[in-house]
């Protein structure tokens, strides 16, 4: 907390205030046992030093079963949650959740609890892992994902593709054409969507 106070004070003194304060980093921020308290403290600091800045939370959605995490995320301006597919086998192969009880249906149900105060972030790609195809731009992945988005009714959807080298060299970017086609289908449901290539 002290480091954040010093940084915000320095920025305020320089007249260079941040646009956004983001909870992210090395690991899952919502897994911190005091995440809710950290959000509250950050809101107070934001209000004091940079009241125009927005608070964003980037999460893999694995801690949404904890009510205190959901309540804290309701307080941030941009509650950004990952949902790369609705296929459990795909998630186990690609995302490799640490929790063996992880189920995408549970995550979708928890995302619906935000009542629209959520931004869904999804990465589309091509390639293979351990000899298995992990391209998720095919209709068998996109159609059920779109149905989940319809059920969740997020404020916005952000779709993107691989941006930097991955641990597995067999992974490749989805094309702008594919991302734009998916983006249009989200927008056709009346939900704002951005695509990053």
Q: Each PLM stretch: what is its role?
A:
Residues 1-22, 37:
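Conserved alpha-helical substructure of the radical SAM core
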């Amino acid at each position: 907390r002290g480091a954040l106070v010093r940084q915000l004070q320095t920025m305020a003194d320089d007249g260079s205030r941040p646009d956004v304060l983001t909870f992210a980093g090395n690991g899952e921020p919502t897994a911190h046992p005091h995440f809710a308290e950290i959000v509250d403290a950050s809101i107070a600091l934001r209000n004091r030093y940079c009241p125009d800045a927005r608070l964003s939370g980037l999460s893999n959605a694995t801690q949404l079963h904890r009510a205190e995490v959901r309540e804290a995320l309701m307080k941030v301006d941009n509650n950004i949650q990952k949902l790369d597919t609705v296929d459990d086998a795909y998630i186990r192969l690609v995302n490799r959740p640490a929790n063996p009880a992880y189920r995408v249906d549970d995550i979708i149900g928890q995302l619906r609890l935000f009542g629209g105060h959520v931004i869904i972030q999804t990465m589309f790609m091509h390639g293979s892992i351990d000899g298995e195809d992990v391209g998720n731009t095919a209709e068998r992945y996109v159609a059920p994902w779109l149905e989940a988005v319809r059920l969740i009714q997020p404020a916005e959807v952000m779709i993107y593709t691989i941006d930097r080298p991955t641990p597995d060299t067999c992974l490749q970017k989805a094309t702008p054409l594919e991302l734009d086609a998916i983006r249009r289908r989200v927008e056709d449901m009346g939900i704002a969507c951005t695509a990053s290539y």
